[in-house]
Structure formats: structure tokens, C-alpha cells
């Protein structure tokens, strides 16, 4: 994926405002593996940290992105996880995005098609998605809405089937399709034990958001039948 090092990138601020990252104070990464950067968390610990360098063309190996995932707490929300995503612009590291609304975040994954996926989930039994997704549009990293599709996907599920928890995203091979996989619950199910089968949800990006193209439903009987019981 070709990503110019000197492109103008944007940072999302509260209330949806955007500001150029070059207007933000440069950040030193000398202690990226031990010291929390730009964090709101108290007693903050660095869980993972690293770099994603340019992997294409004349700039191969040049610095592009860096990240931290963090753990700590706030007085208002208790124990939390967080992430900080940084971009290399004009010789400096500046903040691209950050979030402190999940229980855990994981190292970002960069696809060959210019999708940057940072997995995350919330606390509690629901383990709802706190993922972040960005798409390179030749000049900047554009944040992609990953939540709206969940409000309408029920229209494409079988009757009496619902999604009660977070889904498992697979964005690693966008050439084949963007995918979300999940178990399905029936109305009488316990939160622990879905009996409604499974769904593979095929997604695409339209106007800056994930949209549902198709839902492949796998009934519970097909999912649960062991190979030894298959008809020969």
C-alpha cells in the first residue's frame, strides 16, 4: 500500500471537529514501550507498542504509523483500556487518533488494500465492539463508521434471531470481502448460551461507513453436528 509520508492527515476531536495533525505538538517516542503517551488513564501501563512502516515503493521501510495499547483507570469509568495511534508527518510523530472507551485494545492490522483495523472490545459479558477502522484515501486516514450497520442488520437475520454481543471482524483480506462473524441468540436464550446458529455478515465501505451486503446464515444443527455423525 502506498502512503505518502508528507501527506496532510487529520485528527478527530470532540464534537466531530477536525484539525491538521501538523498543528499538534510533536511527540517523542523514545519511551514508547514503557511510558503511556497522551493518555487520560491513571496508573497507566503500556500493554503493547510498535511501528508500522511503509511497505511499498521507494519509501519502503520509512516510518509511517506507531501505536500503544494501554491499561489503567479513570475515577468516572473505573478500569479501562486505551489506545494511541500516531502518524509520522514531516519528520515528526503526531497523534492520529486515541480512544479510552474499551476494556482492551489490540495492535492495529494494516491490509494491502489500505485498511487499518485496530481491534477492541468493552468490558462486561457483552464484550461489545470498540474497534476502530480507517481507510487510506491517498491523502489521509479516514475514520470509518463501524457502528451504524449493527442497528439495521436485524432486518436481514432470520426471524427470532438476534445479535446480543460483539462480533468478530475479519478485515485482513478485503479483496475477498470484509466480514463480521457472530453467534445468534433466540429470545428465550440465556446470555451465555446462544442457540440460534451463526451468521457470516459480508460488508463493504460506502460513504465512510460499513454497510451490509449479504448475511449468510448457518443453522445451529449444521454448526453443532460433529464430523463423525455426517452421513457417509
Predicted regions and their residues:
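Short aromatic loop motif centered on NTY/YTY
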Residues: 101-136, 140-201, 218-229
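Bacterial N-terminal signal peptides
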Residues: 7-17
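Positively charged n-region of N-terminal signal peptides that target proteins for export
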Residues: 1-4
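Surface-exposed loop/turn elements that mediate protein-protein interactions on large endomembrane-trafficking
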Residues: 82-98, 133-148, 205, 209
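Terminal domain-start segments
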Residues: 21-103, 225-231
